[in-house]
Amino acid sequence: MNNKLYGNLIFELSHEGRKGYSLPENTFGNYELPLCARRKTDAELPQCDELTVVRHYTNHSENNFGVNNGFYPLGSCTMKYNPIVNEETASMPGFAALHPLQPAETCQGALEAYYNMQKALSDITGLSEFTLNPFAGAHGELTGLMIIRTYHQHNADHKRTKVLVPDSAHGTNPASAAVCGLEVVEVKSTPDGLVDVDDLKTHLDDTIAAMMMTNPNTLGLFESDIPEIARLVHECGALMYYDGANLNPMLGACRPGDMGFDVMHINLHKTFSTPHGGGGPGSGPVGVGKGLEQFLPRPRVVKDGSEYKMDTEYAGISVGEFLGNFATMLRAYTYILSLGKENLPMVGPLATLNANYIKESLKDAYELPITGVCKHEFV
């Protein structure tokens, strides 16, 4: 509750001379700060006693709304389940107290978790290697497109400057392509909401760098022609990009790598239970198929015998400082371990079952433009 006693701002409760701190005995001696490091005026900090500070922030904390006290509606493809055990792992002192500049030999446990997460995502998706460096899903998407662009430039195939994007794609797909300096070419959908393969064929030539797809697509439909689509795109020399926003219903059913995709990003909040929105920060790991590993951004964690090290080869390939949002990765890794290989494959079927139950419950009250079985979401 809000009340006048504890105010809306801690500054409103400030009184000259009140303090709620005590410092330990000075055992280091007194040292004069150089003039360049001294403030010219006192810092404008509130002066409050301990009880006032505790009660003020406790009072405001009761106004918070989140997944622990109510339904937190975000995008339909975003998980609404953020297990508390994930937070316990991420806040363990052995992880939370680390400094990103620590020598690798002093944080082997953290690097082992990071390395194991890379391998877990490879197993789940069927792709060769992963980087966990991108700081969000859209950041991962842009990183994936930059990998594709670099791959073609490495092969001196500079004319490939176009990206095929279905008209049912997520809005981030054309946006990421444009930011990457690539031209977007729209591919039409059939009346059933799937990619029109005949229309796709009219766009395929030696200027195409990649095709971006979400499978299932934004309508919640599985693209059943994906083997044919992948074959056609590869035959023209382009790569297949998988937008992992809708990966959740695929767990236990099929893997993007097995469908013919070469590059993908994963939204950890959409598939592996990490917080989203105000509960962030995000994380957008990027995976690549065989032959593309050298284009992944650095640094990466590698295993040398029984030791974990930082791979800084091709150090110029970077998408941000250090190793991404480490604590977010820990939350997702905890979720994967808590389910294990036996239960993780049940995520997809259960997500599909839940969505179809809701769809059938609403069909008499809402118009359904697309009929039939959906995956994890529907329109």
Region spans (language model):
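Conserved N-terminal alpha-helix of the aminotransferase class I/II PLP-enzyme fold
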Residues: 43, 49-64, 93-135, 140
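N-terminal glycine-rich, Lys/His-bearing helix-loop that initiates the first secondary-structure elements
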Residues: 1-97
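Conserved PLP-enzyme active-site core in the AAT-like
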Residues: 109-112, 139-304
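Gly-rich Lys/Arg/Thr-decorated short loops/hinges at beta-loop-alpha junctions or inter-strand turns
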Residues: 37-38, 92-105, 123-125, 178-185, ...
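A glycine-rich phosphate-binding loop feature that marks nucleotide/adenosyl-phosphate handling sites
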Residues: 73-82, 134-140, 166-169, 246-252, ...
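Active-site C-terminal subdomain of aminotransferase-like
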Residues: 263-376
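Structured alpha-helical segments in the cores of large, soluble enzyme domains
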Residues: 110-122, 170-174, 196-204, 229, ...
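Conserved phosphate/anionic-ligand binding catalytic regions in large, soluble enzymes, centered on
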Residues: 65-86, 133-141, 272-287, 322-328
